[in-house]
């Protein structure tokens, strides 16, 4: 059987490891990630207004970058739409 001081040290070590794990998990959950959203207001029919796209994306998130791109990987096919890329929280809400 272990001595009481050894048991206390073992229990303390376990709690310290658990506390560090919880802190790391909370920190990683708050780390910014890149989000993407197609903004329909800048895309009208077969055209996309690049200035309006950039401005709407900046309104969504201060560091957002808006570009007009086609929905498909082949630029000659498909209609252009406003793609907004921005930093967001883990729940998808943008950083302001």
UniProtKB/Swiss-Prot annotation:
Q: Which Pfam families match?
A: SLR1-BP
UniProt record, GO biological process: defense response to fungus; killing of cells of another organism
Query: What compartments host this protein?
Result: Secreted
In which broad location class does this protein mainly occur, judging by the first location in its UniProt entry? Answer: secreted
Q: Name one GO cellular component term.
A: extracellular region
| InterPro entries on file | DEFL, Scorpion_toxin-like
Range of residues in the leader sequence: 1-29
Q: What keywords appear on the UniProt entry?
A: Antimicrobial, Disulfide bond, Fungicide, Plant defense, Secreted, Signal
Domain of life, per UniProt, equals Eukaryota
SMART domains per record = Knot1
Q: Which residue pairs form cystines in this protein? A: 35-88, 48-68, 53-82, 57-84
The Swiss-Prot or TrEMBL record describes its family as follows: Belongs to the DEFL family.
- Which named protein is this? Defensin-like protein 151
Organism, scientific name: Arabidopsis thaliana (Mouse-ear cress)
Gene coding for it:
LCR17
